[in-house]
Amino acid sequence: MKILKTNYTKRLLLIIFLLIGFSLQAQVKKVFTPRYSASITGDVKMVGNNMLSRTSTGSYNGEQDNHDFVDNVYVDIDSDASTFNSSSANLTNPYPNDSCLQIEKVLLYWAAADKGIDVAGIETENQPNWNYNNVKLMLPGQTTYTTINADEVIYRGKNQNPHINNDPYVCVKDITNSVKNLGNPFGKYQVANVEAKTGFLVSHENTNTGTSGGWQVIMVYKSDKLKARNITLFDGYANVTSSQNNFD
């Protein structure tokens, strides 16, 4: 067994957050705690994508912020009638010539602002036929989706009393074993059905907070040929405003 000598410490603070209204004071709603921590000869890669934009399939390259528009729609690239949104991202092999490269940990996060429409004092669901803590996942080399359920709902605004601003939620799923079983863990990761508010979002405080939603894959990999590192992945939830955004 090779004893690892750590020559420096690398900590990855994974902050899954949604930018919300400017009137609310910045607060940590779910304390950030380690989900993974190890000393390995390896590193981390991350990919992800949005689920809301100006058009369902076109790239937005304008000068304005996406969430400032009042008619944002779901991104939907898959032509699959069973999905209401979908997007993908390519995770490339950082060391394609390293035959010793192994997958250590892979986590999938998804998050969105999920405030419904207030009808006679009752807030509707944005996707009444879908559970927000489920998504559809298509891994590299696959041609069909698998529906997965979150290992943990890190935070959900709708569970708070009173509701918090734009009803954000954050979910996480450990997909390490599924990725390890692939012939090639690198390639296109595609996610569908991240529930989120479309169009225009007015917070519970009657401010324009903007729509938001997306997903992220975090992969920790290792190889005897890489440097020794201490890698720690944190997750939690904090409200972030333009004036108060320092969580050090």
Label each region the model flagged:
Residues 1-29:
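Bacterial Sec-dependent N-terminal signal peptides
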Residues 27-248:
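Disulfide-rich extracellular domains of secreted proteins
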